[in-house]
Amino acid sequence: MDSHTTEKRRGSYLRVLFKNGRLPVEGFLWNCDPLTGTLILIQPLTPNTDEVEDTHYRFYGIMSDAIQTIEPDESMSPLNQQSLAEYDSLLTS
């Protein structure tokens, strides 16, 4: 994913399918490293389904060589700019 596509899709909900057939990972695109192609996805957690009470989100770092396909899920609303700014603050402070 090039930097232009990353910026355009930032905050979009994506499903990543793996070359090795493991279960797909889903989440909102936070960033993509321009050198390695590593994706960073944010997966907000809901209280009903999580084993850890204090956790509100999960981050996935997915190496580009493990990715078979990236599928956008248009049925999910993208994160708004305020939410992205909050994650930016969390990850860069």
Curated annotation (Swiss-Prot):
GO terms for cellular component: SMN complex. The gene is gem6. Residues 1-76 form the Sm domain. The SMN complex catalyzes the assembly of small nuclear ribonucleoproteins (snRNPs), the building blocks of the spliceosome, and thereby plays an important role in the splicing of cellular pre-mRNAs. Most spliceosomal snRNPs contain a common set of Sm proteins smb1, smd1, smd2, smd3, sme1, smf1 and smg1 that assemble in a heptameric protein ring on the Sm site of the small nuclear RNA to form the core snRNP (Sm core). In the cytosol, the Sm proteins smd1, smd2, sme1, smf1 and smg1 (5Sm) are trapped in an inactive 6S pICln-Sm complex by the chaperone saf5. GO terms for biological process: spliceosomal snRNP assembly. Keywords: mRNA processing, mRNA splicing. It comes from the Eukaryota. Disruption phenotype: Inviable cell population. The keyword ATP-binding does not apply. Coiled coil: none annotated. GO terms for molecular function: RNA binding. Disulfide bonds: none annotated. Part of the core SMN complex at least composed of smn1, yip11/gem2, gem6, gem7 and gem8. Interacts with gem7; the interaction is direct. This is Uncharacterized protein new12.
